[in-house]
Amino acid sequence: MEFRWFVQTNTTLFLVFTPKPRYEESFESMDNSTFANRWNLDEIESNYQTWLKEPASLDSRWQIFFEGFQLGYEGNGHQPTRTHSDSAEPEVGDYSIEKHARLYGAIYAYRDIGHTQGTFDPLKDEIPENPRLSLDRLGFEPKDLGEVHFTGNYLGGVRMTMKDILDRLKKTYCGNVGVEYLHLQATDKRRWIQSKIEPNDNQPSFSHDEKLRILRKIIQAEEFENFLHTRYVGQKRFSLEGGETLITALDSIFQKCPDEGVEEIVMGMAHRGRLNVLANVMGKSPEFIFREFSENFVPDGAHGSGDVKYHLGYESVRTTSSGQQVVIHLSSNPSHLEAVNGVVEGKARARQRLRGDSDRKRVLPILVHGDAAMAGQGVVAEVFNFSKLPGYRTGGTVHVVVNNQIGFTTDPTDARSSLYCTDVAKIVEAPIFHVNGNDPLAVAMVAELALAYRQKFGEDVVIDVNCYRKHGHNEADDPAFTQPILYQRIKKMPQVSELLTEKMIKEGDVTLEESEEIHKRLRRHLDASLEKVRTVKKSSTFEGSVAVHQIPYDFAPVQTAVKKKELEKVAQALTTCPRGFNLNSKIKRQIETKAKKFKSGRGIDWALAEQLAFGSLMLEGTPVRLSGQDSERGTFSHRHAVWYDSEDRTRYVPLLQMEDRQGKFCVYNSLLSEAAVLAFDYGYSLDYPRMLAIWEAQFGDFVNGAQVIIDQFIMSAEDKWGSVSDLVMLLPHGFEGQGPEHSSARLERFLQGCAEDNVVVVNLSTPAQYFHALRRQKRKEYAKPLIVMAPKSLLRHKLCVSELKEFTSGGFQEFITDPTPPKSPSTLVLCSGKVYYDLMEAREVIRSPKAAIVRVEQFYPFHEEKFKEVLGPFAKTKRLVWCQEEPKNMGAWNFLAPLIEESLGRRPEFVGRSATASPATGSLTLHKREQSELIASALGQTIPTSNK
């Protein structure tokens, strides 16, 4: 039980709760909405009488409350009243239960809302008074300040005057560090934070050497920005000026990592201050950074199109001041704010697996946010939601907010509806430390505390560095257009190093001459680096680069067939139910059917083919990760990768039961998110390439919820940054009359982004093809994302099956010729995916079919030579048709038509739905009519059935 504060009437004690205000200016207006939750004094008195007689019979929190009251009561000159006699009655004097409750209320109030009176905003000279923390509102009068009180759970339960208690509470909770933590439900976490900030009044305490290190680092950050500002006038660099203590925060975390057991950091951040972080945290050579500013700069051995300098990733091994090494990775990122967050979490999780870090203590993810993006971008909340989820947790992330209190030109009042930009972190009960960016020692203290919290509890924590932006959004921008008063104030702000130097001079930690010498030494170093750039023409591109150069894509066959005896091991595990396991009767029938099909070697469907691919890879030592909404069971109830006991819900994973030395199989039902989860799995695939990583959409239609991740990472990352991934995306796609939201994975959008062999895009028509495509991902010598237009109705289509021999021999086919072509066909129909079966079924009812049907299984990269070879026997057909279910402005038509024409010298005729704004009709009747017409048109026939 924790109290706010109490108000006494003649008969009732009120426990008062007040809603938190949106902004500091609204404290008084919000306070008018105060409501009281009435407590009858009899209940307190009754509990007190019980405590006097049998204290152990009460809840421990009541015991603490009454012990505190009793000690305080005695400490004010009263005689002890506690007795175990039935006639015991406490004498109620000046020091009453009510006053003790008010004291507890005051302590709680400062812990809860003390941050609203904090001095952590460097741009504010005066903090609006919060009336809820005034003496009278806390239930005291000036004459009470001299009374001695027992502090209960504050400061370990000591006796202090009310004045001393309030002074220390103000110093702790209303200073340059404001702490929000009472939203944490776990008592041990709240008490841990209290134990770290209350005994020292939340004030930094560093040794002489530590202070000098912090001073040197802040000077280093400032001199770097000053140098760029004067040497590269007007060039975009997204300066950190005004927020240089970001370097303090990151360096402090880095320095403490070895003490906390952290061996590796994976970090993500946007462009603001990125060059400074690269130079002064990551250790990237200033010489190389300066070289990138050259107008004629082209990296040696450049890969692809490249990207601007403040988007590039980097990795390094850094040595702390204590001589211990920490590996640091900075992820490449686009300008799309916060998009990299999920990627960082996935990379961190992958690196934890690589290190065998099951406790998730040795690899630390750090995310650097901007204040406007933190509150504005929905993916921030999605990534916070990873925090405690089995398939996505990373043992806690340290979030650092560069809160320069402006978003390009947007004020906080226009950027968010909450008091703080960090309020979103409360959804996972992350503690939040607001700190004054002009106080590097406080920033360093908070950074160390945040790291310790993460390591102790394995959960997220937020550092909100309140600072300012000295220039505009970029160096060519004039912020005075929209924030003239703010920037008049900013122009008068002293540099942080000046403030710290002044403080350290007063405390005898440095002299002005020593501080100036640090500045001079750093300037000389930067000048020397620039001189090298001007005189030395070449520099290694791969100094810390995260780019990966790989062999080009080629169409050489890949060995993907598997020996029958290996597949038998997989099938045995898939179709064996453990003794005593109460398996759902429907699943039991499914596995019995699977067993029969495998034994016969015929009728192997899509789900079984997938599991044979997974299992065979695992037997070869390749682990598999499958992640997505409902992926354990499968959206269409086809996979059942995990079984649950019908009586006690015991979990059983058949694919984990094959052999002792097999690869791992990790299948996770994801949170209901596309962007964050796809980003996570993409990041995972980057840093753990040994694993087959798969992300599955519930329906392909929903994949555009992750369009930023697709465009900025999956399709273009190799070209921009040399980032190599072989992530598989399963996107259920097909027109089956389910309406515009459950028909299309927007194939055309993926094909539009295809160039330079960046991805592989397939629309497969047989289970065996799917089997070989999955295995090919891990058996080829290059890595490319695989985008699969996955089936829905084909999962149970009687014709969409394969024979076992197709798995034990052969391999992937980019094109599949007609298995039963008519004699002398006059029409050649090219198609892909599900529509092939509609065409085949329709052709069966035609007496004298004249159309041959060839399937395109892989759209990109397009194997032109193989295409010509497969179509060779049909060169004399009079009519060449491309048939698709999608409207003309969608699907593969606009991508394939020019390729077909270039290969064959003939432009195909389009057969499909007319161009529409929406992918599909919502009417089942209209859908059937459209489907019937396009099938008939493709075959050059009228199909005699009402259902087509």
Segments the model singles out, each with a brief description of its role:
Residues 32, 69-246, 262:
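Extended, charge-enriched "interface" segments that sit outside catalytic cores
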Residues 26-69, 73:
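Subset of Sec-pathway N-terminal targeting signals
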Residues 407-418, 426-462, 467-471:
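Conserved phosphate-handling catalytic cores of large alpha/beta enzymes
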Residues 263-429, 433, 636-688:
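Cofactor-binding active-site loop characterized by glycine-rich and histidine/acidic residues
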Residues 202-224, 295-345, 349-356, 654, ...:
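Active-site cores of enzymes that catalyze phosphoryl transfer or operate on phosphate-rich substrates
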Residues 223, 227-287, 604-623:
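Active-site pocket-lining segments that scaffold enzyme catalytic pockets across diverse folds
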Residues 98-108, 115-144, 148, 222, ...:
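Flexible, glycine-rich loop/tail regions that form catalytic "lids" or insertion modules at the edges
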